[in-house]
Amino acid sequence: MEITTINQLIAAGSGLIGACIGAGISGWINFRISRSNHDIEKLSFAAGFVAEVESLQKVMRERGYLEAFTSLSNDPDIVAGAKVHYTILIPDNFSRFYNANLNKVGLLGVDRTKLLVQYHQVLQALAQDFKEGSYVNMNGFDKEAIDECIRFFSLALSIGDQIVNYEVGN
């Protein structure tokens, strides 16, 4: 082989190796940027979901719904079979962030996603009892319906607390 051919092969090989190294570094940098953006997105949505749960928890606690129903459950007239009408105005869109970002719920991980979906399903079940035209809205809450609301308010508050106090390492 001639010297010029060897020099050309060395130059071509060096160029090819350099291109491979450059592509590898570029790919790694793009991967890191993409991963960083994904992590930021996860944190952002997690913060939004948790903030909404905290707000809903605060409203339920500040308004004393659980305590009110517990008091009603122990009322002698209710125990004797009377019914009571109890109204809570619940907007259809009480969980706006959750509804607007349902496609991002999975970013929270399996356990936290499960809790978040359960939480909102329990709240939806509660909200149905207070909707205009629902059976208990029209006929009143008897002891059984009141006790069911107590269970659902307790369950919602318990699940909500688990979401708010969830440790990411779990």
Feature annotation, model-predicted:
Residues 1-36:
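Membrane-embedded hydrophobic alpha-helical segments
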